[in-house]
Amino acid sequence: MKLNELRDNPGARPKSKRLGRGIGSGKGKTSGKGVKGQKAREGVSLNGFEGGQLPIYRRLPKRGFNNVNRKDYAPLNVGTLAALIESGKIDAGQKITEATLRAAGVYAGSKLAGVRLLGRGEISQKVEIEVSGASASAIAAIEQAGGSVTTTVARAEPASA
């Protein structure tokens, strides 16, 4: 068998029924749309219209909002950082900054506010890294390997009750 000899199984793609071609076809005259009315006309019925019943988007209360000041950070796991160092994309001997990470192709996009270091994976190399943010487990992993983490964005501590 060759690629140019491949065929569908018989009946795998049934031909669609042609509409409005006589009463003998089973879909003649009104083409399965019933008689008159809004839904029999050309075009689609109104989205969200429930026949006069109060629609669900008006029955339920408004919730939440989109924060225009929200900042998104590119995630970078410790294991990924170790792999980048081993592959030679990043030099562990020099201080690693967000500019270094961007040049190495770790993240791109002007909408991201920076990099957040996360703790998944393991690292054995001693590195000095400066990122926007870091999780406690990531800082512990880097410091256990003899390195240091500097964060440029201060994280607010939760208010104690």
Curated annotation (Swiss-Prot):
Single Gene Ontology MF annotation: rRNA binding
Residue stretches in coiled coil: none
Bias-annotated ranges (Basic and acidic residues): 1-10
Keyword entries, A-Z: Ribonucleoprotein, Ribosomal protein, RNA-binding, rRNA-binding
Residue ranges, compositional bias (Gly residues): 21-35
A Pfam family of this chain: Ribosomal_L27A
Source species, domain of life: Bacteria
Stretches the record annotates as Disordered: 1-42
Record GO biological process: translation
One GO CC term on file: large ribosomal subunit
SUPFAM superfamilies listed in its UniProt record: Ribosomal proteins L15p and L18e
Quaternary assembly: Part of the 50S ribosomal subunit.
Its job: Binds to the 23S rRNA.
PANTHER family: 50S RIBOSOMAL PROTEIN L15, LARGE RIBOSOMAL SUBUNIT PROTEIN UL15M
Assigned protein family: Belongs to the universal ribosomal protein uL15 family.
NCBIfam families: rplO_bact (TIGR01071)
Protein name: Large ribosomal subunit protein uL15
